[in-house]
């Protein structure tokens, strides 16, 4: 039961930029809750011998103001392009059943509100990252290049506890429409992050 995933990640949440919850889970969100989409695009991956490269999984979460209080609501979307076997394997990894970074979040999740197969479009040009899921989700973030930085390199947050990576590039959303699993929010203009991710278990 070995698996390995490599790809790109981005998120968009309801906090102002940058999200204090990402700096540390016990900081407290800017508003009453932290409502977030986490988009993982698997460039290359294999789970128990099943190839899952090219597929996307964007979990949606609604958490209390202080994330460490737990009782998160989590919904998982699996790429409609996945076969039944691929969907089963991805669901096992992203729900934490097969260990890895998502398993570390397990104690914080109070309710898994659903898991759906939906059409997903994922775009990444290096600075802009976008995911569209059916008619309910359309999220795009752009990495932030600080004023005066001639190299064009975006700003980063390092040394954090985060399932995707301990180093995250700071981003801001241009689109933030999220409607799924009974969760409806618009995070346009709010916080975002992006990063490569490499998981194994």
Predicted segments with their positions:
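Charged linear interaction tracts used for macromolecular binding and regulation
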Residues: 72-153
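Extended, charged low-complexity segments
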Residues: 144-201
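Intrinsic-disorder/low-complexity loop/linker signature
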Residues: 49, 126-127, 182
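Aromatic- and glycine-enriched beta-alpha-beta binding-site module
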Residues: 32-103
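N-terminal ordered "arm"
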Residues: 2-45
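Low-complexity, flexible helical/coil segments
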Residues: 47-54, 76, 110-116, 158-159, ...
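A generic structural signal for short, solvent-exposed coil/turn residues
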Residues: 7, 30-32, 68, 112, ...
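Noncatalytic linker/hinge segments flanking ATPase motor cores
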Residues: 22, 51-59, 82, 116-122, ...
């Amino acid at each position: 039961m070995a698996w390995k995933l490599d790809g790109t990640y981005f998120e968009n949440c309801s906090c102002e930029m940058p999200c204090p919850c990402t700096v540390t889970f016990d900081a407290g969100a800017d508003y009453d809750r932290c409502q977030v989409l986490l988009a993982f695009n698997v460039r290359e991956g294999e789970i128990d011998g099943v190839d899952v490269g090219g597929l996307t999984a964007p979990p949606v979460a609604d958490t209390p103001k202080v994330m460490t209080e737990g009782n998160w609501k989590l919904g998982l979307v699996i790429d409609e392009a996945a076969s039944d076997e691929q969907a089963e394997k991805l669901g096992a990894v992203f729900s934490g059943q097969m260990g890895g970074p998502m398993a570390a979040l397990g104690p914080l999740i109070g309710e898994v509100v659903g898991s759906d197969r939906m059409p997903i479009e994922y775009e990444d040009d290096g600075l802009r990252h976008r995911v569209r899921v059916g008619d309910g989700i359309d999220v795009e973030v752009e990495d932030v290049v600080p004023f005066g930085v001639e190299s064009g390199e975006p700003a980063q947050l390092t040394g954090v506890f985060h399932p995707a990576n301990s180093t995250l590039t700071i981003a801001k959303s241009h689109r933030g429409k999220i409607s799924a699993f009974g969760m409806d929010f618009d995070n346009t203009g709010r916080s975002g992050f992006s990063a490569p991710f490499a998981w194994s278990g």
